[in-house]
Amino acid sequence: MVLDGFAAHFDAYLENIVREGKSEHTVAAYRRDLEELFALLAQMPSEDAGGVPQGLSQRDFTAALRRLSQRGLNARTLARKLSSWRQYCAWLVKRGLLHTDPTADIKPPKQPERVPKALPQEWLNRMLDLPVDGGDPLAVRDHALFELMYGSGLRVSEIHGLNADDVYLDEAWVHVTGKGRKQRQVPLTGKSVEALKNYLPLRQTASDGKALFTGRNGTRLSQRQIQKRLAQWAAQNGDGRHVSPHMMRHSYAGHLLQASRDIRAVQELLGHSSLSTTQIYTKLDFDHIARLYDEAHPRAKRQDE
């Protein structure tokens, strides 16, 4: 398949993943990654491109990855782009539009292990226990938002997608639609239930009235707005540290694992499809145990202390 033929089904592919229920953010990322790939393949000299006029090969995609690496992209970003390319190639093969998948045997760049940053439990408790101005609907909304974020460990995309009827306050749980449209039920803390009960009577609603967290005009808060409100809240009330929804989720996972030691339960609560994704939080747990050991064990103290 020549390059023109390879790219010819691009729009049909995007329409297909929209029908599958992929989010706008995911579809936009696939679009960017594939448009970038097409441009790279078109720019390659024939000796790099593996004979594009005759067809595309594994060497073409390896060369494209090498070009992106030379631009300074990190291993995580390269692995994500390769995943986007693979999804497209697999779709073409499945429909008989490509004989074999030239990306199938390409190994993604090895990524350095990254330990998530968790916020101190005491700091979070102090911040979330700050007085809330009950006369300010946005302050009441934000408090409910942040309690839910830390209390249930939801992704920012999951919070963005919540509807009011996803929350069951009497039973103290929330129905969450996660990655890949996977459904799960997550418990609510007592603090989250209380904060949501204070917020719901003040919620501004638009014409559809579905969104749980809305702005002044009643429309659903965007992911960017949620991130911005959290950062502003932390900057105004905290000690200057940067706080993101991802860090709140990491904190939830790390603190829960410290208390429960049940990694399978934490996996279910986080909505991870693979246990290996959850296992990174065991490093946070080990750090906590190591600090306790250093503080408590009589043989852990250095001689000069």
Swiss-Prot record:
Q: Which residue range or ranges hold the Tyr recombinase domain? A: 114-294
UniProt KW keywords: Cell cycle, Cell division, Chromosome partition, Cytoplasm, DNA integration, DNA recombination, DNA-binding
Keyword Cell division on entry: yes
Q: Which GO terms describe its biological process?
A: cell division; chromosome segregation; DNA transposition
Q: Where is the active site?
A: R155, K179, H246, R249, H272, Y281
**Main localisation:** cytoplasm
Q: Which GO terms describe its cellular component?
A: cytoplasm
Domain named Core-binding (CB): which ranges?
Answer: 1-93
Task: Name where it's found.
Answer: Cytoplasm
NCBIfam families according to UniProt: recomb_XerC
The annotated subunit structure for this chain is: Forms a cyclic heterotetrameric complex composed of two molecules of XerC and two molecules of XerD.
Similarity section: Belongs to the 'phage' integrase family. XerC subfamily.
Role played? Site-specific tyrosine recombinase, which acts by catalyzing the cutting and rejoining of the recombining DNA molecules. The XerC-XerD complex is essential to convert dimers of the bacterial chromosome into monomers to permit their segregation at cell division. It also contributes to the segregational stability of plasmids.
The name on file for this protein is Tyrosine recombinase XerC
Q: Can you name the source organism?
A: Neisseria meningitidis serogroup A / serotype 4A (strain DSM 15465 / Z2491)
